[in-house]
From Swiss-Prot:
Major subcellular site: cytoplasm
GO process terms (BP): arginine biosynthetic process via ornithine; L-arginine biosynthetic process
Name the record gives this protein: Acetylglutamate kinase
Presence of keyword Calcium: no
Pathway linked to the protein: Amino-acid biosynthesis; L-arginine biosynthesis; N(2)-acetyl-L-ornithine from L-glutamate: step 2/4
Classification lineage: Bacteria, Bacillati, Bacillota, Bacilli, Bacillales
Positions of substrate binding: 41-42, 63, 156
One GO location term (cellular component): cytoplasm
InterPro entries xref list: AceGlu_kinase-like_sf, AcgluKinase_fam, ArgB, Asp/Glu/Uridylate_kinase
Record bears the keyword Amino-acid biosynthesis: yes
Pfam families per record: AA_kinase
């Protein structure tokens, strides 16, 4: 059975209905695919940091991470959010196992940008053997993007980048679950959805401000993963879970990201 990686961002997480998890469970039970969930937790991390009067800043959508910030991020994502997703799946009869990238050295990472962003890492290796064991045993892996590096140093990894690395390791499709139906642009006063964007078009829309903030690492990590063998990356609306089924059936939904222009996307 083919694997599909679902990245669920922190901004959309609390908006997802039980129907979203039911769709993923149906995909698993019908043999359509083996889902892997990689999640974020930005808004809840922000809230926790604010309560503790810890300042946080972002550079190109990446959170600058000190030891203090890392501890909070790990507590929120690997603890609260991860187990909430697992509970949501198990409450509808599914079987899920919540892990962070630290567990079993699931995600091995190195520090990004020579440490200029603090303890922010990028994944260099994925323990696919462990994930395959979980999936082959009927489970859905749920991964928090806290990774482990040399000397057991922990790193905060952007969730989109972590999901891209997992999809790359399995050479699978990557579905970026959002609360919008794709990349939207206002053209002549009308909002349109770009159903297909190439790398060149993405960079142009970043420069023009159409793609901004947290969407920047989302689309860039999706494009980067394509170079390494990810079958396809797409941004879909998780608030309308039928889009997931429609996409896997080959229908035109969301925004498909490709390296270059292709026909009949």
């Amino acid at each position: 059975m083919t694997t599909v990686v679902f990245k669920v961002g922190g901004s959309v997480l609390n908006q997802l209905s039980p129907k979203f998890y039911q769709v993923l469970l149906q995909l698993k039970e019908t043999g359509t695919c083996n889902p892997i969930i990689v999640h974020g937790g930005g808004p809840e991390i922000n809230e926790a940091l604010s309560k503790m009067n810890i300042k946080t800043e972002f550079v190109d959508g990446l959170r600058v991470t000190s030891e203090e910030v890392l501890s909070i991020a790990e507590m929120v994502m690997s603890g609260t959010i991860n187990k909430r997703i697992v509970s949501s799946i198990q409450s509808i009869g599914g079987n899920a196992l919540g892990l962070s990238g630290v567990d079993g050295k699931l995600l091995r990472a190195k520090q990004m940008h020579d440490g200029k962003l603090g303890l922010v890492g990028e994944v260099v290796e994925v323990n696919t053997e462990w994930l395959s064991i979980i999936m082959n045993s009927g489970g859905i892996p749920v991964i928090s993007p806290i990774a482990i590096g040399d000397a057991d140093k922990r790193y905060n990894v952007n969730g989109d980048m972590a999901a891209g690395a997992v999809a790359e390791a399995f050479q699978s499709k990557l579905i970026l679950v959002s609360n919008i139906p794709g990349v939207i642009e206002s053209v002549n006063g009308e909002e349109i959805i770009h159903h297909h964007l190439t790398k060149q078009q993405v960079e142009s829309k970043i420069d023009s401000g159409v793609i901004y903030g947290g969407m920047i690492p989302k689309v860039r990590s999706a494009l980067a993963s394509l170079k390494s063998g990810v079958a396809e990356s797409v941004i879909l609306n998780g608030l309308n879970p039928i889009e997931i089924k429609n996409y896997l059936e080959g229908k035109t939904v969301g925004t498909v990201l490709t390296e270059r222009e292709v026909e009949h996307v």
